[in-house]
Amino acid sequence: MLRISSSLLLASLLVAVTSASASENYSPYADVDHPTNVYWGDTHVHSSWSPDAGGSGNEKLTPIDAFRFAKGEPIVAHNGQTVRLRRPLDFLLVSDHSEYLGLYPMLEEGYPALLATETGQRWKQLVEEGRRSRVGGEFAASLSSGRDLVGDRSFVPHVWKQVVANAERMNEPGIFTAFIGYEWTSMPGTANLHRNVLFRDGADLTRELVPFSAVESQDPEALWAFLADYEARTGGRVLAIPHNSNMSAGRMFETTRFDGSPQTPDYAERRMRFERVVEATQIKGDSEATTATSPDDEFADFENWDAYAGMGVIGPHEDWMYGGEYVRPALGRGLELRQALGVNPFAFGLIGSTDAHTSLATADDVDFWGKFSSNEPYAGRDQDPFAQLEMPEDATFDFSVAARELPDQLYTASLVSSGYAAVWAHENTRASLFDAMARRETYATTGPRMVVRFFGGWGYEAEDATRPDLARVGYEGGVPMGGELGAGPEGLSPRFLISALRDPEGANLDRAQIVKQWLDPESSAVLERIYDVAVSDGRTIDGDGRARKVVGSSVDVKRARYTNTIGEDALITWWADPDFDAATPAVYYVRVLEIPTPRWTTYDAVKFETKRPQNVPASVQQRAYTSPIWYTPGG
């Protein structure tokens, strides 16, 4: 009989335990490699270095001031009051216009090449006369034609080096990310085709480039070519972020190329290489959805800006334009184009940002500082034009002080206190945040900082929504927002996990919805349906997936207050598509709605004891839009 001593047995057991411990960590978090933090920021803020900002009252707040404000430091605004964010942001892109970048500092400095031009001399004289608004007006008017007003713009590379130096100075990896970039301001015939250019890289790669502007070309393909050349030369990475599609006169998401020719697979691939996310909400209106294309959506038409075609009042808006202006119909068009081209040119994620030209990234109804510094808080600001520019006589459009008979859309009351970009990233660095945007793990909010998760997969179960480690379950069993699902097990429909937590300093939540679009299997037309997947206050979701009972309102308009006596702190749920067809491409995204809260104009009316404007709502339901998840048969 074989005998084993007790000491030998104990030793062998210790070895076994040690071996097991070495191969399997005790800590359940040791191997976690998915993003656990959401970072908040703004990829669209202008300083006094942008000609239109400097021409509309922002004479002194520089890019450095913009970064300081985003970091939570107090700043003295042009009206002499101190302003400070309720909570700091995690990242910022100061996206001053590349067209005549740093014009006013260069005029004040007396940059020789600029003052050697006739226009430069005239502009310097206007600035000395206190007529910056005229210079800003000429800049704004020139954008519709792309005409070069100066001829010699050699001052731009000089200013760009300062732009890069400013971002490098304010960048604090792990604490605050200062992105390097600018805005490319294409506006043919006043159709807004603007893109914000955001670099992953630092000064070592970006310092020597000369920003591409719409003076060189108004065609987005020319911008992409410039960005492709940058990446090829440097090994760096860069994104172009479209914004204000709602003011593009149907051109931002048109089904043709800029020159009117048909889209090609190569075009779609180049677009998706650089345009990974779209700015879906900002001060000049929300671009998520319109009842013109989604007539059954009672929550569409939120703060829309589409009364006229393009940026200027050059003509009435036409119905055909809507499909190329709003995010939701664009996502549907993307499904159609993928069928035709094999590539989806509109497979973009979503973010929000402000487009503030004040250097102040404010997206808060109770502390709204306007689009331009001329809109800084004062009694009756809602009754004044939002852009107080002196337009040239030959301008093709006018939203100036002189044009007092303006449509409602061009008065300050119509401005929207929106929005911010939420990014699920591993850490607060340029590289990590950029990579998250590139993989579309982002969402847009109209200002509140609600925390939203969205996962899609084939194996989630209803009880997964109750798991404390919902995010880990989501990543291990599927894809996050911005991801793509291929064919699943036969007979199964995709399942989704949705988690929405209210802003801890904001309003309760009304509901979480899934918006689905798919191609009709017979006609290939885009179909759409909205499902209420989680609602507050014990309301019932009917058999068609909709909750008909509204959440109500706790808003006291006379005092500009609300209470969290309705709604929920959190909405967390599991949902399986009840109408799924495995043969049909589809796209899904989540929309989260808060309970009603006072609009900024209501707060202003109470603070300044003025009459509240009647052409805008007294209260609004702030919201979040996630990046979509796509399903592709056989993908």
Residue positions per predicted region:
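Positively charged n-region of N-terminal signal peptides that target proteins for export
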Residues: 1-4
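Bacterial N-terminal signal peptides
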Residues: 7-17
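C-terminal functional module detector
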Residues: 22-63, 67-70, 77-116, 152, ...
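Mid-domain alpha/beta scaffold segments of enzyme catalytic cores
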Residues: 124-125, 131-135, 161-165, 177-179
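Acidic, metal/ion-coordinating pockets
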Residues: 211, 222
